[in-house]
Amino acid sequence: MLRCVFALCAALVLALPVHAQRIFENNALRGELVVKAPPEALLNGKPVRLAPGVRIRNQQNLIQLSGTLVDQRLVVNYTLDGMGLVRDVWVLTDEEARRWPWPRTIEESRAWQFDPTLQRWTKP
């Protein structure tokens, strides 16, 4: 009986959710994404196309299909591919969205310094 109690306690401890910090790429930009009719979307109010293999990660870091996000305003971090198509999208949690500053343009990301360990940007 005592073994069962220890096993149950161990299982409960291991089952606790882990709130690990997500790692964003150093070329990720911040913006507001509204998916229209996939692959069409608005990014910061401007029309863009989603790449054919776009990876959209929701707030739990699970892959989500673009069709399930139609007409939702989402605060995101995103990357672009070589053709200017949106390649990776991370839908931000409230805590991640408050992490500031974060570059909104390629020019800002080139001028600012990124610390990959702390996942923080600093302005010059």
Model-derived segments and their meaning:
Residues 2-5, 16-43, 47, 61-124:
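Short, flexible, surface-exposed loop segments at domain boundaries
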Residues 8-14:
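Hydrophobic core
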Residues 51-59:
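Short, structured beta-strand/loop micro-motifs enriched in basic residues and often containing a Trp
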